[in-house]
């Protein structure tokens, strides 16, 4: 019984790489197809932590205006409802936060708009 508990402890503490190696050995040497659920259970704690850390609020950060600065200024002006001077100051002050606390789809949309205008953009 103690041997089984020790084996179970070793099995639970395997890394993802080690689980993949074990699956390969079981398949090639013993003809056993490991169930996908067993691999998911082994990776469960790490996967659960990643899901818990998934962000729901994003900041759109303008890293640089690129070559088409005028187009980027126009895009920032329209996206943020700023005046021309404020938009230009934001673009000139890059890196700067264009908008904060956006949902993922809104942030992705704004990022795409700014990138199409020629800007280098990052989501944080």
From Swiss-Prot:
Pfam families to which the protein is assigned, alphabetical: Ribosomal_L12, Ribosomal_L12_N
Molecular function per GO: mRNA binding; structural constituent of ribosome
Keyword Zinc-finger: no
The keyword Ribosomal protein appears for this protein: yes
InterPro entries membership: Ribosomal_bL12, Ribosomal_bL12_C, Ribosomal_bL12_C/ClpS-like, Ribosomal_bL12_oligo, Ribosomal_bL12_oligo_N_sf
GO cellular component: cytosolic large ribosomal subunit
SUPFAM superfamilies with a match to the protein in the record: ClpS-like, Ribosomal protein L7/12, oligomerisation (N-terminal) domain
Key words of the record: Ribonucleoprotein, Ribosomal protein
Record-level GO BP terms: translation
NCBIfam families in the record: L12
Role summary: Forms part of the ribosomal stalk which helps the ribosome interact with GTP-bound translation factors. Is thus essential for accurate translation.
Record family assignment: Belongs to the bacterial ribosomal protein bL12 family.
Subunit structure: Homodimer. Part of the ribosomal stalk of the 50S ribosomal subunit. Forms a multimeric L10(L12)X complex, where L10 forms an elongated spine to which 2 to 4 L12 dimers bind in a sequential fashion. Binds GTP-bound translation factors.
PANTHER family per record: 39S RIBOSOMAL PROTEIN L12 (PTHR45987), LARGE RIBOSOMAL SUBUNIT PROTEIN BL12M (PTHR45987:SF4)
The protein, known as: Large ribosomal subunit protein bL12
Species per Swiss-Prot/TrEMBL record: Phocaeicola vulgatus (strain ATCC 8482 / DSM 1447 / JCM 5826 / CCUG 4940 / NBRC 14291 / NCTC 11154) (Bacteroides vulgatus)
Underlying gene: rplL
């Amino acid at each position: 019984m103690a041997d089984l508990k020790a084996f179970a402890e070793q099995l639970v503490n395997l890394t993802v790489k080690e689980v993949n190696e074990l699956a390969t050995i079981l398949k090639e040497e013993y003809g056993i197809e490991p169930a996908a659920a067993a691999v998911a259970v082994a990776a469960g704690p790490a996967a659960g932590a990643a899901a818990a850390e998934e962000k729901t609020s994003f900041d759109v950060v303008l890293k640089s205006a690129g070559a088409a600065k005028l187009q980027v200024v126009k895009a920032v002006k329209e996206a943020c409802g700023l005046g021309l001077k404020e938009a230009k100051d934001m673009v000139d002050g890059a890196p700067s936060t264009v908008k904060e606390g956006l949902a993922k789809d809104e942030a992705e949309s704004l990022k795409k708009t700014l990138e199409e205008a020629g800007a280098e953009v990052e989501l944080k």
